[in-house]
Regions:
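Unchanged
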Residues: 1-134
Length: 134
């Protein structure tokens, strides 16, 4: 989903990266599954988002660097389980997992503030919708 073009020049991941950088997040790791070459070309070194730096910045976590290649199709929770050893070595206090399937700007500062305020172990951001079945 991240590499799907939007308005010819952009990709879906651009919304997420711009929102994160706009909120002061300066270390972003992108987990990729398959057919990610065009995404890597698009992201480059992260310069477009001021993420080209020695400390922090943008890094791409390809499937061959993840624990079990065959199980990456399972979803977000399984992806988190696959990279848990890497996450445990991080110095950051909080981890945000976000998908690239929505074209919107998101205020991650409000999410983090609510997370800290409630002293939660996990915080989810979602939109409640009424689904009507015909």
């Amino acid at each position: 989903m991240a590499s799907i073009p939007f308005a010819s020049r952009y990709r879906m991941i651009d919304f997420l990266l711009s929102s994160m950088v706009g909120c002061g997040i300066d270390k972003i790791e992108v987990l990729v599954r398959e057919n990610y070459h065009s995404l890597v070309d698009h992201l480059g070194g992260g310069r477009e988002w001021d993420l080209s730096r020695k400390n922090g910045g943008l890094s791409i976590f390809p499937p061959f660097a993840q624990k079990s290649i065959g199980s990456m199709g399972g979803g977000r929770v399984e992806a988190l389980a696959n990279i848990l050893p890497v996450l445990k070595k991080q110095k950051e206090k909080y981890v945000i997992m976000a998908d690239t399937n929505i074209a919107a700007n998101f205020d991650f500062n409000a999410l983090i503030a609510q997370h800290v305020k409630t002293d939660a172990d996990i915080t989810f951001a979602y939109t409640k919708r009424n689904c009507h079945r015909n």
